[in-house]
Amino acid sequence: MEQPHKRKRKSHELSNSQPSDREPATSTSANAREGDFMEGAIVRITMHNFLTYDHSEVFPGPKLNMIVGANGTGKSSIVCAICLGLAGKTSVLGRGDKVGLYVKRGCQRGSVEIELYRTRGNLIVTREIQVENNQSTWMLNKKHASQKAVEEAVRELHIQVGNLCQFLPQEKVGEFAKMSNSELLEATEKSVGPPEMYEFHCELKTFRTKERDLENVCKEKGNFLEKARQRNERNKLDVERYYMKKRHLDRIQMLEKKKPWVEYETARKELEGVKKERDEMKRKLRFLKEAQEPLLRKIRSVESELQPIEQQMKEMTNRIKEATQKCKQKHDQLELKNKEVDDIKQDMSLKQTEEADRQKRIGHTQLMIRDLQKELQNMGTIEDVTPQIEAINAELRNIQEERARLESESLDLRRDKDEITGEFARLQNRLRSLDDMMKIKEEKLRSRFRDTYTALEWLRKNRDRYEGVVHEPMMLVINVRDARHAKYIETHISVNDLRAFVFQRQDDNDKFMNEMRDTQRLRVNSIIAPTESCSKRPPSRPIETLKPYGFISYLREMFDAPEEVMSYLCHQYRVNDVPIGTEKTKGMIESVIKDLQLRTIYTAEERYNVKKSAYSNNVVSSNSALRPPQFLTTTIDVEERRQLEEQLRAAERQKQSIDQRMAAIREQQANLDRRDNELRANKKKLSDLKSKKRQLEQKISTKQDSLRQMEQNEINLVAIEEEANAKIAAVNNKKVTIMGEYLSHLQSKARLNMEKVYLALQSAGLSAEKTKLETDVRESSAELKRAEVDYTKLDKIKTNLLMTCKTLMKRASEICNMTPGETAVPEELHAAFSLLPETLDEIDAMLNEERTRAECFTGLSDAVVDEYNRREQEIKNLEKELDDKTNELTTYRRNIAEAKERWLNPLKKLVELINVRFSDFFQSMQCAGEVDLHSENEEEYDKYGIRIQVQFRRNTRMHELTPHHQSGGERSVTTMLYLMSLQELNRCPFRVVDEINQGMDPVNERRVFDIVVRAACGVNTSQYFFITPKLLQNLQYAEQMTILCVHNGPQMLPPNKWNEKAFIQRARRRNRT
């Protein structure tokens, strides 16, 4: 399982094998079969203080050597010894990069000695490794030698430990499938081809490069030759025009000699004028600077007076702010007191209004009583309608009771409906919350594994294509019950499985993977759940027995998953038997490992893997820190979601039932209302006749009672007014005190403001004076700056003119070949100069005219005739060089054709032989495979390569071997069968393959083993080392095989005490029982 983080290694009672006093028994048989060894095969390997060994000797057989042993016993140490002992690089092994790391821990030096078979006498190669300086000492046949000499001796025996076709260590098994076609071809040439095949290949690549260089040289020389011929044809006319041009050039030369003298005189006159202007400007500049200095002194004086005033103003402003704040506080207090007085007055006003209203109601009530008494005196006798009213009252009571019952029931139903509606909304919100959490998990999948997310979207749209159950990637369907436990699950389950789809049926899985990999070109993972469910598999022991050690649960109990997913995890990762511990567990980890003998243990922050040797009681454990969780931190309770959906359906049914019952109640209430209205109308007619007198009597009695009550509730306004006036007086006293403090602060503020105004006036006067002075300074500064700019310009012009005069004088002297220090025009030039123009314009005009005429004769010089003759000779030389290069190119092409024939024809035959054996091997496994020589361009020899194509299932097409398309087991099978295809063709003395059967299923592993035995134990085959930690039962073995069992540990019996007869007798007794 892939672990991206480093692991710490921790050993418990682990010891290496003890040094033996004599050679093992296998050495006798090995020496007896020495005649079967091929040239360069390994006869003996001796290791001293090397990796896990104190001292060990290995005597392999001449054919197939099966090196078998439990993990950690030292099988790969033998592979490392072969590589390093034969001058291999540490990079070949893919382990430590320093050779000193291969010495046993605690030792300062170690050694490896390898004896190689040779017909003229065996070769013994010894390498002693020093840890301190990470250096090695080499010996050949017990004599000191250099590493280069050892490498040469190994090369002579055709041993190539850096060739993956010959030497394939455990850490490099995966790199075989990553080799490019060109790399695989070169490795195959070195491994099984004749010695000259790889040399021919290298020559062809070199020849092709040189051929292209020669083609370019011939093309360039041909082009150059043609141009030279054309150019020389034009030179014939140039020779004739040469003398015509020479006359114009002489006149140009004389004009160019006079021109500098005219330029010098012009520049000298201009320089004199500029000097005068500059001196005048210098005097003006000095005057302006002297006039500006008094103004600057005055400005500094004003600034020194202004600074303390501004500081006082800042302090005054702060004090004014403090006084203002205090005034505001007192003002707010006065406002509060005013509001308090208003509240007291308002309360008193309310009492007065209430008393006036009471008096008014008393008068109104007395008037109503007199009116009612008068009406009662005027009434006559009324007929008795009591029986009819009582009958109506009885029916009305029944209706009222029924209405009350229906209303109560309706209220209960509405209450129930409101509760159900609220619960329904709560359930919907919770369900949406769970859906949002699932979207978060899907977003993590999309951002990390884009191909898997694309496949998920496709599956959701096409799920009906599959007959069995198909589960989405594990990270979506696994729900951790507590987010704090996600780190255990993500550490225990590989990321590749977390993003894998889980299928119930094999045919559904094949159909899905064909669609994803072949059609959509997506890199996805899939898993097939076990046929028999393992999800309910019980742990090996109850968790209660582990609680004394700090364990709280098994890993399976910390998350939920669908049946098929949980079944796979129990089967593959044994989550039902992996306990989770705490800090208490970590504190007693030694006892936990020793007493419980668990394979995998988790503490609060670490994971422990424990292995026990199959041959002793030794225990080896390794611990690593837990990975921070990335995918499962978002928890979704699946059971809660199911219950929510069920509760939503039940709530919907209850709402419908309540709505139906409420509709029936409304219908009954409507009927009762109609009957009630009819009865009340009848009763009203009867009651109006009977109860009018009684109503009048009751009204009079009621009004009289109300009148007495109002008369008793008299309000004492005088007491209330006295109490209110007392409260107002107390508040006013407090207001007077506050007002005094307010006026004091206000006066202080006013005084401070006045002081600030005085300071501001002083500051304004000084600032105005400073501004006026600064304005005057700016005006004078502007004029001064302009004067400085003008002076600088004039000084620069004067300097430039002076340099120009010197340059022109120097130039004129050089042109006229005058001696240094001479400033007058030579006498011999006066006559010639007198015939030429006197001004620059006239000289330039004549120069342009003469140059124009001379330019008509382009490409002419004094050596034009010599150039013509020289080019004629050059053309002859180029023709000869072109002929030589053309002949050389023809020879190269002939050599390339011969080398290609010598290389390509044997290579094609070799690849065809490999393909025949490779195809036969795959056919014997009921699969298909082929090997061919592939090249896009036959002339590009560095692009040739060997292409491997395989087909493991009948319903798929053949695919090229790549690191991504095939599974790890399929790549291992292909690698092994390709190496077996080279076995009989190989000219190398031995081949090493380390644990290549890891990841193979049992059927393929058995088939590959049979092929290895047949191929490696044949006639004229090289020595073969096959390292594996396990073997299947009932395998077919051959007499030519040598099985080397690797044991290790402190409880082992030393080899000098072995009794072979006792071993055999014990094995026979065991077989009989």
From Swiss-Prot:
InterPro entries in the record: P-loop_NTPase (IPR027417), Rad50/SbcC_AAA (IPR038729)
Coiled coil (residue ranges): 264-340, 389-444, 641-723, 861-902
Region described as Disordered: spans on this chain: 1-33, 684-705
Phenotype upon gene inactivation: Smc5 depletion in zebrafish embryos using CRISPR/Cas9-mediated genome editing or morpholino gene knockdown results in a significant reduction in head size and aberrant craniofacial patterning in the pharyngeal skeleton.
Region (Flexible hinge), start-end ranges: 435-635
GO cellular component terms attached to this protein's record: chromosome, telomeric region; nucleus; Smc5-Smc6 complex
Gene Ontology molecular function: any one: ATP binding
Keywords from the UniProt entry: ATP-binding, Chromosome, Coiled coil, Nucleotide-binding, Nucleus, Telomere
One Pfam match: AAA_23
Role: Core component of the SMC5-SMC6 complex, a complex involved in repair of DNA double-strand breaks by homologous recombination. The complex may promote sister chromatid homologous recombination by recruiting the SMC1-SMC3 cohesin complex to double-strand breaks. The complex is required for telomere maintenance via recombination and mediates sumoylation of shelterin complex (telosome) components. Required for sister chromatid cohesion during prometaphase and mitotic progression; the function seems to be independent of smc6.
Domain notes: The flexible hinge domain, which separates the large intramolecular coiled coil regions, allows the heterotypic interaction with the corresponding domain of smc6, forming a V-shaped heterodimer.
Protein name listed in UniProt: Structural maintenance of chromosomes protein 5
Species the sequence originates in: Danio rerio
Lineage: Eukaryota, Metazoa, Chordata, Craniata, Vertebrata
